[in-house]
Amino acid sequence: MKAARIAVLAALVVAGWATDARAYDPATTHAVLTERAALASELHRVLGRALSRPLGLFEPVALSLDQLPPDRAQSLEGRLATLDPSSGCTAGPDGVAPALAWVIAGSIIAKTPAERGQDFFYDPSRGSGLSNAGGLASLGNTLGLLLDAGGGFRAFFTGTQFNMTGRPSTEWLHAPENDVGLEAFHANLETAIAGEQPQLRAGALARALLALGGVLTVLEDAGEPAHVRNDYRRAYLGTPGPSPFDRGSRFEQFVAETYGRMGLPTAVKPTERPTLMAFITAADGQGLADRTQRRFFSDGSLPDDAIVDHGTTAAEAMADARGSLPYAYPRLPRLELKVMGRRHYAYTRDKRRLLAYQRVPGRVRFFLDDAVYADTARVLLPEIAGYGAGLINHLFRAEIRVDATGGLALVSVVGARGAVKKGEIRVFAEDAAGLRKALTTVQPGAAGVRVNVPAGTKKVAAVLRGEDDAGEFVAVGESAVK
């Protein structure tokens, strides 16, 4: 009898609460934010000049899955197969897609399988990830994933499914097991130069671009209020759609439905930051997660309803509401509490709707509606794209210039922030068949280093995995022998 009651309870929990933590809609919002960032960045020029891809972002690049271990190839193939062909970021039967399509595809598959979503939260005020575990909500979410995503009872009983806790996104960004994270980006970008065969280099470039998209997704979620305010229960478990498996918060659904793939602003100005981590969080408070948490409410981080009776003053109601806030910012401005039943808005100094509120019998109710979401999206979306464009520029800030004439090549590092502190330049000679062999290793220097080039060399390429004042980087460059 007890087991039967537990089964019924679990079914009710699933029916009421099942969802996943995916933040901005991958196929629409993440895709277009990534696209806008890439187009506004220097990536087109970098691909054309440093990697000899003359069409830049529109250069066809082939991904060969047989270059990967079988388990990784199967995982990547399955995730790429979920992409909608109408999205414009799927490869053809030959595995070829434009460079830009690979970046967008990486941003979409970054949170597959679904339990990866638990590692995309970051609370900059506490330096922590998602912490909403426990209780029936956690059970319901896990069972929902089991039924919806086919995770199976083995995963449920071994604890491998999403339990509403996760590591900080800043940690997941660097995790070796994240195949579309920073380590994958750096390693594959190296191989895109150092690989012996053209097919190997092309496949590595495709995977580097996929990883670039995954890195951008981590950053983009730092511009989603629920993801920087530890808000999973309210934002993601309160399913607004007709189905219990209608995924996503009200805000992300509003953004996807309002803007789609075409409605986001096209004018994007890249944001500059001193280090990679500073794009997300920094002591100056200008990381995207810092700025988002400080300026915007999410559905689950609003003030608690304030009790109002005949003896309650407006000041007392305000004090109660402010005292219930889980974060110091944004601050709750003065409220208009005289009129019963009318919807009001609290505004920021720049006339942006911060939240909606309404006095009803016995209390003041705080909530977010479409007008608040519209103001939030209007401010946040261009800012996210600007941070994304800046991050791409930051990752490709250093470049290796190769000037190959006759039997000599001058190899130099440009664009590094300060002195290059570690790493060596690996130089390669490419023959008429496109095969590359290691030529030599030299120390980086702004003045350049001359390298002897063997007869028959058609192209000289170089790569450096190093570190400068802004952190780790991979610099690449190649040039035909004149």
Predicted features by range, described:
Residues 396-407, 482:
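Short, compositionally biased P/S/T/A/G/V-rich stretches that sit at domain boundaries
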Residues 21-214, 218-221, 225-371, 375-378, ...:
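N-terminal, motif-rich segments that launch catalysis or mediate targeting to/interaction with membranes
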Residues 5-8, 76:
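Terminal low-complexity, poorly structured segments
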Residues 7-16:
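Bacterial N-terminal signal peptides
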Residues 379-400:
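Conserved, well-ordered alpha-helix/loop/beta-strand core segments that scaffold catalytic motifs
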Residues 1-5, 18:
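Positively charged n-region of N-terminal signal peptides that target proteins for export
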